[in-house]
Amino acid sequence: MVREVLERLMRGENLNFSEALATMNELMEGKYTEAQVAAFLVALKMKGETEEEISAFALALREKARRVITQTEGLVDTCGTGGDGRQTFNISTAAAFVVAGAGIPVAKHGNRSVSSRSGSADVLEALGVNIDLDAKGTARCVDEIGIGFLFAPNLHPAMRHVAKTRREIGVRTVFNILGPLANPANIVGQVLGVFTPELQETLAKVLNNLGVERAFVVHGHGGLDEVSLTGPTRVFELNRGKIDSYLFDPLSYGFSYCSLRDLQGGDAFENARLLQEILDGKPGPLRDVVLLNAAFGIMAGGVNDFREALVMARESIDKGLAAEKLEKLRRLSHEIKEAG
C-alpha cells in the first residue's frame, strides 16, 4: 500500500477518507520506513492536503491517543499551529488561564517549541507546572480545578514513529496542522490560530467533521497564528455546523494597535515572567492581546456576545481568578506526580 499511496500523491491525486485513515494508521503503527515517512510527508505537502485527508488523519491520531476522560463537559482548547515565525509571547497559553478563570473549563493541548523559542509546554514548565502527567492525572486537573495541560508526547505515543523524520526534514508538514486537531479530550469548543489564511476555511470544516460545536479559526494581521493587536484578524467561525467568515478589528472594541515587537517574547523563562505579570494585572499590549484571544475562547465555551466575553476576560484577570487557576494547576500537578 505504501508504494501505491506515494505514487498517487506524486501524481497529484487526493486520497479519500478511508484511504487517508488507513494510511495514517499504518504510519502510526510504524509500518513505514523513515525514508517512506519523509517521502509521504513531502509528497502530501507538494500536492496540498484536502479537508477529507486532514479529517481522516486527525481522527486516526485521536483514536491512537491515550484518551483524557473527564467528568467535565463543555471543554475548550486554545492553541495555534505554530510556524508563523513571529516569535510572539505565549498568547494562547496565557489566554487559557483567563478562559478558565472566567468559568469555562479548558483542556489545553500542547507541546514544546516548534518554531519559537518557547512552546506552551516550555513556558508552563518554567512557571513551575508539572507537565509530565498521564491521561488520568490530566483529567483530574480538568475536573478539580477547571484547567489541565495535555502534554502531547505523553498522550500520543504513536507519534514516535514520525518524530525523527519530522525533525530531520525541517519543513512544515501536515503534522503542524494536525497537532491542534488531535486533542485527546472531548473538546466541544476551540480557538485555533493558523499560520496561513489559506488553511482557515478547510480547518473550520475539519473541526466540524471532528464534532467540535463552536470554533474560531483565526489568522491575525502580521501573519500571526493568534487574534492580533497589530491590525485586523480574519476569522472563520464554526457554530453548530454553520461556518461564517469576517474581519475582526480590535479598534471597534476600544483597543489600540501596537507593533509586532510589543507582542514578542523571549525564552521560556522570560515568557513565564511576562505571563505571570499579565495574570497579576500588568497593563499593556500583552494584556490586551491576551484579553482578545481569551474573549474568543470564552465564546467558544458558549457565550454568544463578544463584549460580554470581553468583560468576563477582564474580570478573570482583575479579580485574580486567572492567576488562581495557574497557582492551583501548579500545586495540583505536583501533588498528582508525587502521589504516583
From Swiss-Prot:
One of its GO terms (molecular function) is anthranilate phosphoribosyltransferase activity. Pathway: Amino-acid biosynthesis; L-tryptophan biosynthesis; L-tryptophan from chorismate: step 2/5. GO terms for cellular component: cytosol. SUPFAM superfamilies: Nucleoside phosphorylase/phosphoribosyltransferase catalytic domain, Nucleoside phosphorylase/phosphoribosyltransferase N-terminal domain. It is an enzyme of class 2 (transferase). It catalyses: N-(5-phospho-beta-D-ribosyl)anthranilate + diphosphate = 5-phospho-alpha-D-ribose 1-diphosphate + anthranilate. Its cofactor is Mg(2+). Gene3D superfamilies: Nucleoside phosphorylase/phosphoribosyltransferase catalytic domain, Transferase, Pyrimidine Nucleoside Phosphorylase, Chain C. GO terms for biological process: L-tryptophan biosynthetic process. Keywords: Amino-acid biosynthesis, Aromatic amino acid biosynthesis, Glycosyltransferase, Magnesium, Metal-binding, Transferase, Tryptophan biosynthesis. Anthranilate 1 binds at residues 80, 111. Its EC number is 2.4.2.18. Mg(2+) 1 binds at residues 92, 226. Binds 2 magnesium ions per monomer. Anthranilate 2 binds at residue 166. 5-phospho-alpha-D-ribose 1-diphosphate binds at residues 80, 83-84, 88, 90-93, 108-116, 120. Mg(2+) 2 binds at residues 225-226. Catalyzes the transfer of the phosphoribosyl group of 5-phosphorylribose-1-pyrophosphate (PRPP) to anthranilate to yield N-(5'-phosphoribosyl)-anthranilate (PRA). Homodimer. Belongs to the anthranilate phosphoribosyltransferase family. This is Anthranilate phosphoribosyltransferase. It comes from Carboxydothermus hydrogenoformans (strain ATCC BAA-161 / DSM 6008 / Z-2901). The lineage of its organism: Bacteria, Bacillati, Bacillota, Clostridia, Thermoanaerobacterales. The gene is trpD.
